[in-house]
């Protein structure tokens, strides 16, 4: 029995909301033998880009690169399965997506969580980019280069009991200007929670007092394009 058959046989598959281009399932181990040390019993995520094996390979390759470079707060890859399509499997981050979580919370929890999201992004942006092979910074607008998430929005941030466990949908990671991620999250916070909550995200990132609004606006246009 190969790995995919083990996952089909011994894990319960529950569909998750995600990118419309991908099928995403949460896998929980149901017991009664296998799996063993090579098929972990922790919850897994199975993800497959619909009709595009290359995109599934691409995201899995990025997860492997982040694991090799010891980047924390991101999914840990388990395996890639290919046969008439492709599925990537990774260890599930505990918690729920922040877009759902925050809409159920009292304002003080929303404020605290947004500050944490800002701190998490600041941590991600501090990762070493000297050996990063994924470059998206050719345009002149990219001047302050960092390790970028590439699709940093509330639904891609995972929250567990009021703390951030990491982020998902890592297919777009790479070298960009820090304002690309700042703009993407700012747009999403405005849409989901309201403009009045932006300051707490900026405070967590420690950019509140020196935010370049003109540059942010330009990147908002780029993100929305």
Model-predicted regions and their roles:
Residues 6-15:
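Conserved N-terminal boundary motif of the eukaryotic protein kinase catalytic domain
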Residues 18-22, 33-34, 42-88, 104-119, ...:
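A conserved alpha-helical element in kinase catalytic cores
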Residues 1-7, 94, 101-150, 212-215:
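An alpha-helical support segment within catalytic cores of ATP-dependent transferases
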Residues 23-40, 123-180:
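Active-site acidic catalytic loop and adjacent metal/ATP-binding pocket
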Residues 67-70, 121-129, 193, 205, ...:
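A general structural signal marking secondary-structure boundaries and capping sites
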Residues 53, 145-148, 160-211, 221:
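Active-site Asp-x-Gly
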Residues 88-96:
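Short pocket-lining segment of the protein kinase catalytic domain that shapes the ATP-binding cleft
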């Amino acid at each position: 029995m190969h790995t995919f058959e083990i996952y089909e046989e011994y894990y319960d598959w529950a569909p998750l909301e995600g990118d419309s281009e991908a099928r995403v399932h949460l896998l929980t181990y149901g017991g009664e033998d296998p799996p063993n040390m090579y098929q972990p019993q922790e919850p897994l995520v199975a993800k497959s880009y619909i009709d595009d094996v290359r995109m599934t390979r691409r995201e899995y390759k990025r997860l492997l690169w982040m694991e090799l470079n010891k980047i924390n707060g991101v999914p840990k890859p388990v395996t890639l399965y290919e046969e008439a399509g492709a599925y990537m499997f990774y260890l599930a981050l505990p918690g729920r997506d922040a877009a759902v979580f925050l809409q159920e919370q009292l304002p003080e929890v929303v404020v605290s969580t947004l500050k944490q999201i800002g701190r998490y992004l600041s941590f991600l942006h501090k990762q070493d980019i000297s050996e990063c092979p994924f470059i998206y910074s050719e345009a002149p607008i990219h001047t302050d280069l960092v390790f970028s998430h590439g699709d940093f929005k509330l639904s891609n941030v995972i929250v567990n009991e009021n703390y951030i466990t990491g982020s998902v949908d890592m297919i777009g990671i790479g070298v960009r200007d820090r304002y690309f991620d700042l703009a993407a999250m700012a747009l999403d916070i405005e849409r989901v929670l309201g403009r009045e909550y932006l300051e707490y995200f900026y405070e967590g990132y420690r950019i509140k007092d020196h935010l370049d609004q003109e540059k942010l606006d330009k990147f908002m246009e780029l993100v929305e394009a």
